[in-house]
């Protein structure tokens, strides 16, 4: 069993809307098991990872429901036309930055794929958990329509 004890952390109680100082937060196998006032004489099992958090505020991970982890450029044509390996390499610092800002889960709304999600899940790279939608859907002529503008009067070229 993987047990973590955050000792004496500040924790926001969302029911009372109070920031409670000196709380011990017990986590087992990735799940919060209890939040109790700090008890200096409490038994701590061997192998427990104890993190002294006095003066620090503990909060759950943030979730962003609309990201594009491969959007390293604001120019969508540059982003869409770059080789996949470049898109991946440019996504790595973006993903790590998301994690360092507290986002532990993101929904990629177009661009990032299952492979990037799997790379973070298996700790191959640092980043948030990614729920990838795959390719973006867009209306004709919208920002996701990668076709160039055309002034052709007969778009299909089939009339004589």
Model-inferred region functions:
Residues 56-122, 140-145:
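Metal-associated gating/positioning segment near the N- to mid-region
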Residues 2, 11, 15-59:
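Histidine-rich, glycine-flanked metal-binding segment
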Residues 42, 114-115, 136:
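Short secondary-structure capping/turn micro-motifs that flank functional sites
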Residues 124-160:
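Metal-coordinating catalytic core of metallo-dependent amide/deamination hydrolases
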Residues 47, 103, 127-129:
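A generic structural signal for alpha->beta connector loops
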